[in-house]
A protein has these predicted regions:
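Conserved catalytic core of nucleotide polymerization and phosphodiester-bond processing enzymes
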Residues: 1-123
Length: 123
């Protein structure tokens, strides 16, 4: 599950040996490869990546809700970036704190702040 509980499942299995095998649901893999063949979950690297990406998306969405509830309106969100009109740098720093604390984590979450007259001039 992602940080906020979204399910990330890869329920495909393949033999635990180094050769090209077709990944399939567990029951079908047992029938195809036999009961004595050791099976492992297929595509675990994809499952881990999906879990990480889903958690990052959850954190960004939660931060956007918290920003909105603080009285500010996010203009646009792209991947893990949020563009917001602010009065000054201190307002941007407050938004940064909101984003960093949107989801409680054991490892601190850092948020970079860039301010400019337009998105292309932000630094």
């Amino acid at each position: 599950r992602s940080l906020l509980g979204r399910k990330c499942r890869f329920d495909l299995w393949e033999p635990d040996r180094f050769e090209m095998n077709k990944a399939m649901p567990f029951e079908q893999a047992v029938q195809e490869y036999g009961k004595t063949t050791k099976l492992k979950r297929a595509y675990t690297y994809k499952a881990l990546n999906r879990l990480i990406q889903a958690s990052a998306a959850d954190m960004t969405k939660k931060a956007m809700v918290d920003i909105y509830q603080s009285g500010r309106v996010p203009l646009i969100q792209i991947h893990d970036e949020v563009a917001i009109s602010v009065k000054d740098r201190s307002d941007a720093e407050n938004i940064s704190r909101i984003m960093e604390n949107a989801v409680p984590l054991e490892v601190p979450n850092k948020c970079d702040v860039e301010v400019g007259s337009c998105w292309g001039n932000a630094s």
